[in-house]
Amino acid sequence: AGDQNLFTSLYPTLSQQLPREPMEWRRSYGRAPKMIHLESNFVQFKEELLPKEGNKALLTFPFLHIYWTECCDTEVYKTTVKDDITKWQNVLKAHNSVDWLIVVVESDAKKKNKTNILPRTSIVDKIRNDFCNKQSDRCVVLSDPLKDSSRSQESWNAFLTKLRTLLLMSFTKNLGKFEDDMRTLREKRTEPGWSFCEYFMVQELAFVFEMLQQFEALIVQYDELDALFSPYVVNFGAGGKC
C-alpha cells in the first residue's frame, strides 16, 4: 500500500536480496530449529485479498502488509498520507490482519525540492505516535536506498533484517494456526460426516515445506495423508462408502 511508484523502484533490489541471508526458523512443539531462506511474492494491496471469515487456507492471503511513503512535507502528511494510512489500517483491522509495517523512505533529492518540510525524525515520530502505539518497531526508516553509500547500505541491510524477521514471525503464526485447524479436523475423523476432501487441504502444508526446502517435513505430511486415505480406498473396494 502507499506509494506504488516508490515500491516499484525498490522492488528489483528487494526481491533479489531478501532471500540471500538465511533465517533461523523456530517452530512449536519442541521441533528442532531450521535455517531457511525466505522468498516472498509481493502483491498490490487489495481488500479482496485479505482473509475472510471461515477461510482456513494458508497460501491464499498475504501474511505481512507494508505501507510505503517518502513523505517529508508537513502539509502532505496532514492532508494526505495520514488519512491514507488510517484507511489502510482500518481495512486491516476489519479483517483481523495485524501484521504490518510502515516504511518511510528518506531521499535527499526529494528533500531538496521541498521547503515546507519537517526533520525526518519528526515525520517518523508523528507516524509512530499516530499509528504504532507500543509497536514503534512497526515503522522503519530507509535512507536513500538507491544511493551508493555506506549509510544507505547500512540502512538497507537493517531494513532487510527487520523485514525477514516480521515475515518469519507472521508466517510462523499463520502456519501454527493452520496446523491447529488441521489437527482439530483430524481428531474428528471418526465422527459422522467427516470429510476427507476438507482435510486434504493439509497438502497445502506440504507445498509450504517444499517451498522452504524442508523435505523431511514435506514427506511427513504426505505420509499422514496416505495413512488417512488408505482406509477409505480399502473400504470403497470392499463395497463401502468413502
Sequence positions of predicted segments:
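Eukaryotic intrinsically disordered, low-complexity segments enriched for acidic and Ser/Thr/Pro residues
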Residues: A1-F200, N235-C242
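Short, charge-rich amphipathic alpha-helical segments embedded
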Residues: F215-E216, V220-C242
